[in-house]
Amino acid sequence: MKDGWTITHDPLRIRLARGKNLFVDLGAERLLAAEKGTEKIAVEIKSFTRPSDMKDLEEAVGQFVVYNHLLRRYYPEYKLFLAVSENTCKTVFEEEAGQTLIEDGIIQLFSFDPNQEVIVRWLP
């Protein structure tokens, strides 16, 4: 992942009680020029390959919500982002269902170009 980020965990493991684990695809950080310290993010990458992009969306959001709540509890320094290709961003997250999730703050998202491995845009 480019754009000034360094991968720190591949995957980022969330250790739960009783030996259970969840794995977020990536943990990353970057140095902040304007302030001391680092910014840390966790990234869950989704492909949206099913015939129904709404089914993919339901699954991705459910997983995002679970991971987000557990990260807040166990790794509060990380902010979780869903990462999708720019094409998926246009076909799913610029439509009503995806826009509602972003506008209501349910998910944080960025799109990337899978060929060049660069972040295209961040959506709040």
What feature does the model see in each segment?
Residues 1, 63-73:
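Metal-dependent nuclease catalytic cores in nucleic-acid-processing enzymes
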Residues 4-6, 106-107:
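Short aromatic/hydrophobic-glycine micro-motifs
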Residues 6-41, 56:
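Active-site metal-binding core of divalent-cation-utilizing nuclease and nuclease-like domains
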Residues 45-57:
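Short beta-strand-loop-alpha-helix junction that forms the active-site gateway
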Residues 52-53, 90-93, 118-121:
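Switch/connector loops and helix/strand junctions flanking conserved nucleotide-binding motifs
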Residues 57, 69-105, 112-114:
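Nucleic-acid nuclease catalytic cores
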Residues 108-124:
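Charged phosphate-binding loop/patch that engages nucleotide di/tri-phosphates or the phosphate backbone
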